């Protein structure tokens, strides 16, 4: 009989290599001319994760200087997408104690709670501008840009109303977007036409869903006392059990997950694999190790995360998704890669049995 020593299989990686790759990605990310919009929000979330994992204050100080420059230049109008930068505001406040960062985070919260367009049971409509671009549509992207941010803020501020709103967003995005037959997430849902529009299982949508769901239990104290958390657990379990089978031989995931002719996409691969680390199920370790090898091959010597698809609306057809360029450096690719590699470094601290 195997010995019960409390030890489970571990990840396979070179710590110095991962730290070096993180350093390269952070430095290259901070050379990008990102702004208050979601590319910066995801990128700088990753920089904050890198600081938390490595303890390298250079990373958070570089970010602090950049954000201070942004603040001096003035604040834009908020949308769901621009609320992604709220993650960095919370992290900078935790680091520095400077109320100006918390004040900006609170202004984003005020927008979400009092101005953002909603439909149905207070479900956030995905917005990318001050215009009503996508009437009564929910997108998986909103889970990262707004719901996860609201959850973090609610926990930090001990505000149960924010926590409840965040969990409500998760609950309804699961109900609207997850396919019960496959466990995979559609990119978007149109509440007016009552359909998923073109109806594809877009890779990055599944990364947004998986990653943010996997963070709930690690963010919310006594999460098991919130009924909607159990829906999140069930949803993530179903999704990861299905999605692991779609991993390619190179350890990656495709831009349309179940389309063998779609290209392998790195931001989706990072978000999905990071969710597996967070989940802690030992059955996923072999998939995580395979992903690490594949993702490392897609980071250039100067810290660019390669083969990341450009900004993607809910496209009209399969070719629309296949045709999105992956030639350029993207903030979300940098940020999700940093989040993934940071999870690897923190694995011994966050490992669990995957139960919740």
Predicted regions and their residues:
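Inter-helical turn/loop segments and adjacent helix faces that build the functional surface
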Residues: 96, 153-164, 216-230, 279-283
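Short, contiguous, pocket-lining structural segments
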Residues: 35, 138-145, 158, 162-165, ...
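Acidic/Ser/Thr-rich, low-complexity mid-to-C-terminal regulatory regions of eukaryotic proteins
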Residues: 184-204
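Oxyanion-binding "anion nests"
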Residues: 210-257
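CBM-like carbohydrate-recognition segments
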Residues: 6-39, 48-58, 69, 76-88, ...
